Swiss-Prot record:
GO CC annotations on file: small ribosomal subunit
Protein name per UniProt: Small ribosomal subunit protein uS5
Signal peptide: none
Biased composition (Basic and acidic residues): 14-23
Sequence segments annotated as region (Disordered): 1-31
Domain S5 DRBM positions: 34-97
Length: 202
């Protein structure tokens, strides 16, 4: 009888371990599936009757490094809370970025306030030639080969939103061909056509 009780207790412990493993594999895996980049953290003050109240704002870029990216802005009394709010806000504004392999389909320019960002496709192995705010957006979006130039404002908030505007302005070659009434062969880059001819997915 005592031996049976010990065996029963052992199986209960294994069941508890299995439950812990299952419970720990959900939200943690979902969180790790995204790439997060904190672009800017600022301290702001609100003047009230009793003095000034300080809080923090965080500009965060979140993406899956596979064509999906979003930007969020969080505000809280503590920096970690502001970042967490920014991450949740970014996830609400996810959008898809058209890509050809590891680069973008065509040159594009985005503008936001006084910020202007120019993006150009690059050959494999070039890497992300960009400054901090632009690089954060491109890496989270999964664009690994691209040339960029930031014109105008150096404010990271304007630069990030200008980069997002540029990525939103991208179109796949099929969309461009349909809009112009041309065959895909006249619009698509040669590398894309070669890849499709070889049976690779683009």
């Amino acid at each position: 009888m005592p031996g049976q009780q010990r065996r029963g207790g052992g199986s209960g412990g294994s069941d508890r371990r299995e439950r812990r493993d299952r419970s720990g594999s959900g939200p943690a895996q979902e969180k790790n599936a995204y790439v997060e980049r904190v672009v800017a953290i600022n301290r702001v003050a609100k003047v009230v009757k009793g003095g000034r109240r300080f809080s923090f704002t965080a500009l965060v870029v979140v993406g899956d490094a596979d064509g999906t990216v979003g930007v969020g802005y969080g505000k809280a009394k503590e920096v970690p809370a502001a970042i967490a709010k920014g991450v949740e806000e970014a996830k609400k504004h996810f959008f898809k970025v058209p890509r050809i392999g590891s680069t973008i389909p065509h040159p594009v320019q985005g503008e936001e306030a006084a910020g202007v960002v120019l993006l150009k496709p690059a050959s494999p192995g070039t890497g992300v030639i960009a400054g901090g705010p632009v690089r954060a957006v491109l890496e989270c979006a999964g664009v690994h080969d691209v040339l960029s130039k930031s014109l105008g404002s150096s404010n990271p908030i304007n630069i990030v939103h200008a980069t997002v505007a540029a990525l939103r302005g991208l179109m796949r070659p099929e969309e461009i061909a349909a809009r112009r009434g041309l065959p895909l062969e006249d619009v698509a880059p040669p590398a894309m056509l070669r890849a499709r001819a070889a049976g690779a997915s683009v």
